[in-house]
Regions:
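Membrane-spanning alpha-helical segments of multipass transporters and channels
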Residues: 3-206
């Protein structure tokens, strides 16, 4: 019985006893969604980060507001026409940016990706959403909107669960995580890298 095992252990040699003390329990591991390396695990965070920074640079380089002279030339302009006027161009550039980043992840960095097509789709969707956010902030508030975008960037880098589990961050960031776009974009990309779990991918994009 158990007594025999204990006596056998006590009577064993030093090496057997040290092995038991160092590892009294042997775990049987079964990895459900394995990730090949640290770079692949961090790819969603840095991909989403680069898309956001690209949107900030886009807003800084391109003019979003019409000049007063141009407004006089175009009579009877409505507010929604002014708003939508250059958004399409912003979105097209954002699609090119995000597509380039995601293709670089897949073919240059060669990250692990179980669903490359969905990964690219997540990148495009993220690019469009970030471009619309940046465009709206800029056309509504001007340079103040760009500053808001930078502040949001800092908050999301610290509080979106990109580098550490969100549960390990201060309570403020835990409360903010559900409101941050980074959280959902990274969630969708992680699904593509490690493997899909139910409808988590589509929920993250939705």
């Amino acid at each position: 019985g158990e007594g025999e095992k204990i006596r056998g252990l006590l009577g064993a040699g030093t090496s057997e006893l040290s092995e038991f003390v160092s590892a009294p329990v042997v775990l049987d591991k079964k990895v459900m969604f394995p990730v090949a390396n640290y770079g692949s695990a961090m790819a969603p965070f840095y991909t989403v980060l680069s898309i956001w920074v690209g949107a900030i640079v886009l807003a800084a380089m391109l003019k979003v507001n019409l000049t007063e002279e141009r407004k006089r030339e175009l009579e009877d302009l409505r507010d929604y026409q002014v708003y939508l006027g250059r958004m399409v161009f912003f979105i097209v550039i954002a699609l090119l940016q995000s597509g380039l980043v995601c293709l670089g992840d897949l073919f240059f960095l060669e990250i692990q990706c179980e669903h490359p097509g969905l990964f690219l789709l997540a990148g495009w969707f993220t690019g469009v959403v970030f471009a619309v956010i940046m465009y709206t902030l800029t056309i509504s508030f001007g340079d103040v909107g760009k500053a808001i975008a930078v502040i949001l960037l800092v908050i999301q880098v610290a509080g979106s669960g990109g580098t550490f589990p969100i549960e390990m961050t201060p309570q403020f960031f835990q409360n903010m995580a559900g409101l941050m776009p980074f959280t959902y974009s990274m969630g969708a990309m992680r699904e593509c890298i490690g493997g899909l779990y139910g409808s988590t991918y589509w929920i993250s994009l939705g």
